[in-house]
Amino acid sequence: MFTSALKTVSATGLGLTMALTPAVEVEPRVLVVGMPGPVASGYFKLGANKDPAGREISVNSRHLILDGRPWFPVIGEFHFSRHPQSEWRESLIKMRDGGIRGVSTYVFWNHHEEIEGEWDWEGRKNLRCFLEICRDVGLMAVVRIGPWCNGEARYGGFPDWIEKSQKWPAPKRWGLRPEHPEYLASVQRLYHQIGQQMQGHLWKDGGPVVGIQLDNEYSGPSKYLMSLKKLAIEAGMDVPLFTKTGWPRMVDPMPEGEVIPFYGAYAEAAWEGSTEVSADIAYNYLFRAQRIDESIASDVNTVSGGEDSESRDRYPFLTAETGSGMFVSYHRRSRLDPRDSASLALCQIGSGCAGIGYYMYHGGENPDGKLTTLQKSTINGDVFDIAVKSYDFQAPIGQFGQIRPHYHWLRRLNLFLEDFGGDLARMPAFLPASNSVNPTNTSDLRWSVRSDGHAGFLFVNNYQRLQPMPEHRQVRFEVRLPNGMRATFPESPVTIPADSFFFWPFHWDLNGIRLLHATAQPLLKEEDGEGGLTVVFAETPRVTAEFVFDPATLKNPSETEKPVVIKPGISQPIELIGADGRVLRIVLLSEKDSLSLKRKTKTSKLEFEEFPRMRSTPVTLELVENLGTPRNWRSSNPEFQLPVAPADWDFQEASVWRLRLPEGLDMKGNPILRIHYQGDVARLLLNGRLINDNFYNGEVFEIGLRRFAPEILTGELTLQILPLQEAMPVYFEPGAKPRFNAEGLALKIERVEVVERVREQLANLAAKKMAD
């Protein structure tokens, strides 16, 4: 139990004070909460939903159910074929340690049958092995089996022989698929191959696969998805949950209960055909009833809306693509703030989300194709370009396994969802009538409540990407419950800090003791085996942490006649004894500690992230070619106004450097090569082979070295950079655009370094891992 590492004091002891000042009379912001209506069920056409141990997955109109209890799944997207097989286990463990409990992954058809009839399931394309590791590390899996995927892959994952086939007419618009028996016969063969890979790894077998997504972003007739479901089951893929994206709107609705729609929302839209700040994305920072982000696929989608209002009362609000990052396209060089993703996720949860899927949670790289490169590009008729190799996505875990700041922000949220998500899933969202639906309105505070009519959580989002948000002074809330009770808090008005986002509980039963409200964010809980309960909270920065308990539920009611104000610190949690004798302990962590808190360990002590001590070593550069000649960035199509990415031949005019790595690098620690540069596009080649590329967005170009060892230690490492042209229309984040010279060009290397953990720390980490 946590208390094995903590000294406790009573509510009148150390580490806290009692608020003695009277509450200031301020008119609270009021929300009337109704009693949730009955859930609907019985119409869902689930597949085999029991595992050999009898654990059952089911669903109703409000939430998923696991083992008879409400279940709030937390899923992270990670594409197995975009990552080396040798690093899968390490990556999946990082995901698990970040609070992820399930992995979603695409099966890109052209990664496995680039040439018709030639199947490739080896190495990084071995789906069976990937699922085995998911099972071994304790992660569920949702497999997005296509046949069309998107994922910024070449032709959305369609092999060229499918995309360019003359056997059937091309679909009339984006979002449709070929309607031809030979096409479906090819899909049937694909599904048979995938089914063989999954054999023995489905939920019914005791395996990790609990769900399958059919196609992606499909907007045609429902009969197509019904055909895919039939083909999947015939191929042996009988799983509890069959899903689809809830966008765009289909020609006709799916038969009820056959397929569950999953939704999405992003912090940026790198696909937009614009070089201005995206206006539509700002709506994702509002609490709202609408589930669909209509900006998704707006580059090509001509069908407005999605299965939203029609399905809102019949399906739970689940997401497949809550954006935890964003790719960098050639014409939109986004650079995300960690809070962009964290507050976006909070907005979705505060709007009623009952299961969250982060896209992408782990970045990757496009594999080498046998015939072509495998990225989305304008050469193939797409409306934007992405990098040839890199699919880093600015994800919480980067392309080379780098841990980024939003990994910690999302982990803090995920810890809460693991321990309390089941309670939250039962609670629908209630939105104040005063909530603005206009994201340009920054004067009205954005808040919502999720409640079961008895208790709940109040969500506040005072953050919006690229929009400074003001503080709100003299704020109190009043939640009026259907039983006549009210939760009015805080006791005294507070200032909601600028650019902040958080949630607070009210009328919460904690081990028989009712927490009337707290101005702190719950993180996780632990039972001590003797009937006691410890609950860990995170402070809301610049807001006093105030806890108010119902005296009638305490053994000594006089102990908390006034609000309890707690100061952050793990050494002295407060301890309360309920009227029934059970013990409740409250621990409050500082902002910093809450972001470094890890899942409880085998010793049941709170464990915090030890941020590694890093060492930087400069890399020797030798200039080989000093060209940097401007290229023609315009499309050959005069109607296409956006710039197009450089082709291989354009790099004949690049400036070129030869890099010499420092000696003695410990490749086991995965040292990172960091290239600080300004320019348009940078490419790194090893013995003439492209190993990574980067569209400049103001961030450092990073390459993990371990996967290229030992070749990279002795081979020729070459860096190519093309100049960025000031006249080229490209979107940059504020402050990210480089400085241009008198000729309107930007090309500069500031420094190149290798960053690695110090060896002593690596040895300590290895010893600790063996001890655990």
Range-by-range predicted roles:
Residues 28, 172, 183-198, 205-213, ...:
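Carbohydrate-binding surfaces of carbohydrate-active enzymes
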Residues 74-76, 103-105, 141-145, 210-214, ...:
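Hydrophobic faces of well-ordered beta-strands that scaffold small-molecule active sites
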Residues 71, 691-692:
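Short hydrophobic beta-strand segments in globular cytosolic domains
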Residues 10-19:
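Bacterial N-terminal signal peptides
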Residues 88-156, 160, 229-234:
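Aromatic-lined substrate-binding rim segments of carbohydrate-active enzymes
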Residues 36-38, 44-56, 61-86, 93-97, ...:
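Extended substrate-binding grooves/exosites of carbohydrate-active enzymes
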Residues 665-687, 719-720:
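Aromatic-lined ligand-binding clefts that engage carbohydrates, nucleic acids, or primary amines
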Residues 30, 38-50, 56-58, 66, ...:
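Extended carbohydrate-recognition surfaces in non-catalytic/accessory domains of CAZymes
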